Amino acid sequence: MPGWLTLPTLCRFLLWAFTIFHKAQGDPASHPGPHYLLPPIHEVIHSHRGATATLPCVLGTTPPSYKVRWSKVEPGELRETLILITNGLHARGYGPLGGRARMRRGHRLDASLVIAGVRLEDEGRYRCELINGIEDESVALTLSLEGVVFPYQPSRGRYQFNYYEAKQACEEQDGRLATYSQLYQAWTEGLDWCNAGWLLEGSVRYPVLTARAPCGGRGRPGIRSYGPRDRMRDRYDAFCFTSALAGQVFFVPGRLTLSEAHAACRRRGAVVAKVGHLYAAWKFSGLDQCDGGWLADGSVRFPITTPRPRCGGLPDPGVRSFGFPRPQQAAYGTYCYAEN
């Protein structure tokens, strides 16, 4: 009858349509990957210190019996840290992060992980793994924190830290050792520093925007690398990373010694700010103060967001340093930090 497809014509049409769809989708057998877990729409989740972050993990369907295992892939180490295991009904947390982590459970196929009170050490790569006893599968996501990288050296001068001392020094200044990706991001934002420093992965590098002879030669700008280093014996500076503050930094004027600076902050219900506090206040709160002030490590610094004459002498915003004056020198104010 006119207007009706014949059987051979219908078969040819269906074969053509299947072929086009098959080519567009790819052959599942030739592209191994998740069968139960859906690939994440965004593989990088952005957050900041103190926030609540959600790492999405969603099942397309559920096998008859399964568990979901969340873990954190530790940078520079061939191991994963277990965070949480759930069977869809009950969940159990493990380790220091497990106490701040829970399942979102927005619906029956939701295996997303919620992390409360995000900390600096939470940044990194995470794995959501479905275990069904036959063919396990996983998806990976990265938690990225908004922050700022700052170079750090002690009062004794440059190249004093082995890897473990550099790690401790950053933590004492309200930070942690920066990762390579954090240093790279800082370089794209203008960080130019000619002293090599440890990174979290155990590498030693330094960022150069203006190539020059005393700073790795006159080659192209970039991140210079010293290659593999001995974590115990080799000594360099540190590149630290910090993020948004839970409190505020403020300046107390005066001509104070370091001990008088501590007393001045205590009278105001605060403590002398750490280096990481000052960098975070400069980066996230726009702190701009053309006065040197004591910090907790004994250094004297001041933050500039709007460069101007007779205020550091440099054309770019940043945190300027007067080094480490004698603690008894009564010549500076102080920067205090108070929790909200």
Swiss-Prot record:
Record domain Link: where: 148-242, 245-338
SUPFAM superfamilies assigned: C-type lectin-like, Immunoglobulin
Residues annotated as signal peptide: 1-26
Taxonomy, superkingdom: Eukaryota
GO CC terms, sorted: extracellular matrix; extracellular space; node of Ranvier; perineuronal net; synapse
Any one GO BP annotation for this protein: central nervous system development
Subcellular location: Secreted, Extracellular space, Extracellular matrix
Pfam families, per database record: V-set, Xlink
PROSITE patterns, A to Z: IG_LIKE, LINK_1, LINK_2
UniProt main location, coarse: secreted
GO molecular function, one term: hyaluronic acid binding
Tissue distribution of the protein: Expressed only in adult brain.
Coiled-coil parts of chain: none
Paired cysteines (S-S): C57-C128, C170-C240, C194-C215, C265-C336, C290-C311
Keywords: Disulfide bond, Extracellular matrix, Hyaluronic acid, Immunoglobulin domain, Repeat, Secreted, Signal
Ranges where the Ig-like V-type domain occurs: 34-144
Function per UniProt: Mediates a firm binding of versican V2 to hyaluronic acid. May play a pivotal role in the formation of the hyaluronan-associated matrix in the central nervous system (CNS) which facilitates neuronal conduction and general structural stabilization. Binds to hyaluronic acid.
Similarity annotation: Belongs to the HAPLN family.
Name the UniProt record assigns to this protein: Hyaluronan and proteoglycan link protein 2
Protein source organism: Homo sapiens (Human)
Lineage summary: Eukaryota, Metazoa, Chordata, Craniata, Vertebrata
